[in-house]
């Protein structure tokens, strides 16, 4: 389950704090985060199969990150790569609102996804699986393979840990510690019996 935790306009010195794990499709070859030769403004990892990315930033203050929406029944084998949605925003010059209109036009062609994207002025979450778009107010958010702030145990623990880690900045150690959380959520039956 991929996880993106972020604090938007919640710290006086850091307008955006992100802690994220990409922990699915391990067999898919990737390149580590670096500035791209064909898009030198973009700092991101790279999907070596389809050429896109799952998370990146630019020197101009643009940010985008993607999670897959888990719904195997809706998967289309011929759908375009969702990683293209991230790089299209990062390498583009359109405003977040203009990009939102572009997303709405192409969203149905893709398998389920959630996309966080924005610049230093605004941050948006877009899902093609139910909630559409949402402008994010200042706060701490968690996104996994369902909708923004779905109260899954890993998301809830991560948001709480990120909120606490904000108080330790500029010390980054608590951010890395929260990403090492390997707790396993109890099955619904186990939780009901407890």
Regions of interest found by a model, annotated:
Residues 1-194:
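N-terminal nucleophile
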């Amino acid at each position: 389950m991929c996880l993106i935790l972020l604090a938007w306009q919640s710290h006086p010195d850091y307008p955006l704090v992100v802690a994220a794990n990409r922990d699915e499709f391990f067999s898919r070859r990737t390149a580590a985060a670096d500035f791209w030769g064909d898009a030198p403004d973009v700092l991101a990892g790279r999907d070596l199969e389809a050429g896109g990315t799952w998370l990146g930033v630019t020197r101009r203050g643009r940010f985008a990150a993607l999670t897959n929406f888990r719904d195997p029944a809706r998967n289309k084998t011929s759908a375009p790569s969702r990683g293209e949605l991230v790089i299209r925003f990062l390498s583009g010059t359109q405003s977040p609102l203009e990009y939102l209109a572009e997303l709405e036009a192409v969203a149905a062609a893709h398998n389920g996804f959630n996309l966080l994207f924005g610049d230093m002025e605004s941050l948006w979450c877009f899902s093609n699986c139910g909630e559409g778009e949402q402008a994010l107010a200042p706060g701490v958010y968690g996104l996994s393979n369902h909708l923004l702030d779905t109260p899954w145990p890993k998301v809830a623990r991560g948001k709480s840990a990120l909120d606490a880690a904000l108080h330790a900045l500029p010390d980054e150690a608590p951010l890395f510690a929260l990403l090492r959380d390997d707790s396993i959520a109890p099955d619904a039956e186990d939780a009901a019996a407890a």
